[in-house]
């Protein structure tokens, strides 16, 4: 039952776009000459996909009992994404312009999303859209450059645990591959996290430059220390770093170096224009 759920959702999404006049194969809208002029009418929203999903399930002739199980499982899960803060972000006719956002200083705060899985979902959706926008801009301008800072990255790029769903493993693997891919499009991804041991191994491997501040937990010191060629003695020294000190390593270096920032950053300074 679980195995067929993604295919039902995929069919519902495709049908929802077809209902709005889209030819999926040609990427053209049959109802409007220029659908981008009126996007609110030419693209389905989350609640419309849910209604289509009900029709898709009913069309499969699963039998009453199995149909009710599918509806109860899928609809209840997805309907939650149309409520509250998630609903305002996902179940909407208009969206923020990601391409315009690339040329501005933008902070996206997800504090109002209390559930960890919801934060993971939104981070994944945003990162995916940013990556596509970066690719598009780089095609027009090969000198295009952009920086994205991903804070608390373990929410999205956590190390898969034994017994976890295969979908999460695939998601982590996909975004790990994305990290390695976007560099050639002028994108710089900065991943900040206080618990490196929670990050997927692909993330630690695919980052070019690593800056390590004081770490106390042994598993964290070994997780990051192994990726920057630290000896056991050097890993133990990570507990002794002072404020403003860090261990820095970049690809191609023979060994990591210890650095100290002369002047601490003043976080009370005026905002940057």
Predicted feature locations:
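Short, surface-exposed linear segments at secondary-structure transitions and domain or protein termini
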Residues: 265-273
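P-loop NTPase motor domains
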Residues: 1-180, 184-187, 242, 246-252
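Conserved ATP-driven motor cores of ASCE-family P-loop NTPases powering translocation/secretion/packaging/pilus
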Residues: 170-264
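Flexible loop/turn segments at secondary-structure boundaries
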Residues: 52, 114-117, 155-158, 197-200, ...
């Amino acid at each position: 039952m679980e195995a067929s759920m993604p295919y039902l959702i995929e069919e519902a999404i495709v049908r929802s776009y077809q209902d709005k006049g889209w030819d999926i194969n040609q990427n053209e809208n049959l109802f409007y000459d220029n659908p981008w002029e009126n996007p609110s009418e030419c693209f389905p929203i989350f609640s419309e996909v849910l209604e289509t999903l009900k029709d898709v399930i009913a069309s499969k002739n699963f039998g009453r009992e199995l149909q009710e199980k599918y509806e109860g499982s899928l609809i209840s899960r997805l309907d939650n994404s149309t409520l509250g803060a998630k609903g305002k972000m996902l179940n909407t006719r208009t969206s923020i312009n990601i391409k315009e956002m690339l040329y501005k200083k933008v902070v996206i705060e997800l504090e109002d999303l209390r559930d960890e899985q919801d934060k993971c979902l939104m981070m994944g959706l945003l990162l995916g859209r940013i990556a596509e926008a970066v690719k598009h801009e780089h095609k027009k301008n090969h000198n295009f450059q952009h920086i994205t800072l991903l804070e608390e990255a373990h929410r999205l790029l956590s190390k898969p645990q034994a017994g976890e769903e295969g979908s999460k493993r695939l998601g982590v693997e996909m975004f790990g591959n994305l990290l390695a891919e976007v560099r050639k499009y002028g994108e710089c991804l900065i991943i900040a996290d206080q618990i490196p041991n929670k990050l997927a191994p692909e993330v630690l491997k695919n980052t070019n430059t690593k800056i390590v501040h004081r770490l106390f937990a042994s598993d964290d010191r070994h997780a990051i220390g192994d990726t920057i060629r630290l000896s056991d003695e050097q890993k133990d020294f990570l507990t002794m770093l002072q404020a403003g000190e860090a261990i820095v390593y970049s690809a191609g270096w023979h060994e990591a170096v210890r650095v100290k920032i002369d002047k601490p950053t003043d976080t009370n300074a005026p905002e940057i224009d």
